[in-house]
A protein has these predicted regions:
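Exported/periplasmic ABC-transporter solute-binding proteins
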Residues: 2-13, 19-24, 29-173
Length: 173
């Protein structure tokens, strides 16, 4: 999920704007470990948690979205002492799964990949400045234009999109 990064590539002329396809959408979710007891039920009462795992907003797109949602709720700055900042979503997921953190914020698809966490709540898109979109594009200058075109067509085929849906993504139409 990196529309900001894709836009930067367009701005730097590495990618032509007309070639960008917003292929998939994901959701941000609040999770806890299956064996963890928590009073937290929703994003709005996340302050009840002792520890909160999120991706580092400086480098992890999921962390940027988590910060956005918590900022919209007026909670981000007030909770800084409770954060464990992960270097990636998998690290956050593992902390929550092992009960090292009481709750965490990850993508829905990541939560779905673990048997050791449960989803407490989905983040309403109104808490985000933009939805969690996965854009794809070919490079403006590539020696492998034919292969790139074939790949772009392949990932947009009905059968490919069905596989993405099986993993919890929503096809962005």
């Amino acid at each position: 999920a990196a529309t900001k990064q894709m836009n930067a590539l367009v701005d730097e002329k590495y990618i032509n704007d007309k070639d960008v396809v917003n292929l998939l959408e994901n959701k941000l979710v609040l999770i806890t470990g299956k064996q963890t007891t928590t009073e937290v039920k929703d994003f709005s009462d996340i302050a009840k948690a002792e520890t909160i795992a999120i991706g580092d907003p400086e480098v992890v797109p999921a962390g940027q979205y988590a910060k956005m949602a918590l900022t919209h709720l007026g909670l981000y700055d007030a909770l800084t002492s409770k954060y464990s900042l992960g270097g990636n979503v998998t690290e956050v997921l593992n902390w929550v799964a092992s009960s090292s953190s009481e709750v965490g914020i990850v993508y829905s698809t990541d939560a779905k990949s673990s048997k050791d966490v449960k989803v407490l709540a989905k983040c309403d898109n109104s808490l985000l400045d933009e939805p969690v979109i996965y854009p794809v594009a070919k490079l403006a200058k590539t020696k492998h234009s034919d292969e790139t075109e074939k790949f772009m067509k392949f990932i947009q085929k009905k059968s490919s999109l069905k596989q993405f849906e099986n993993y919890g993504f929503t096809v962005n139409k």
